[in-house]
UniProtKB/Swiss-Prot annotation:
Subcellular location: Secreted
Gene3D superfamilies: Antimicrobial Peptide, Beta-defensin 2, Chain A (3.10.360.10)
Protein name: Beta-defensin 135
Record bears the keyword Chloroplast: no
Gene, per the UniProt record: DEFB135
Family, similarity comment: Belongs to the beta-defensin family.
Species assigned in the record: Homo sapiens (Human)
Pfam families to which the protein is assigned, alphabetical: Defensin_beta_2 (PF13841)
Length: 77
């Protein structure tokens, strides 16, 4: 009887730790917040689109790509 209980406990623990491959990870909204920059107006990407500019780096490989209408006006020389 004890063997059956241990086996049942192992099966239940195995099912609890199983993560389906298609739905694992944070949801889309959380990913968007953590992959954004420039006051949530920009997106961290390896390469910016044609209509975007970058001013800062998100990390060592990603650029903060921002639409020029959200960038401040540069003054000076």
């Amino acid at each position: 009887m004890a063997t059956r209980s241990v086996l049942l406990a192992l099966v239940v623990l195995n099912l609890l730790f199983y993560v389906p491959p298609g739905r694992s990870g944070p949801n889309v909204y959380i990913q968007k917040i953590f992959a954004s920059c420039w006051r949530l107006q920009g997106t961290c990407r390896p390469k910016c689109l044609k209509n975007e500019q970058y001013r800062i780096l998100c990390d060592t490989i990603h650029l903060c790509c921002v639409n020029p209408k959200y960038l401040p006006i540069l003054t000076g020389k």
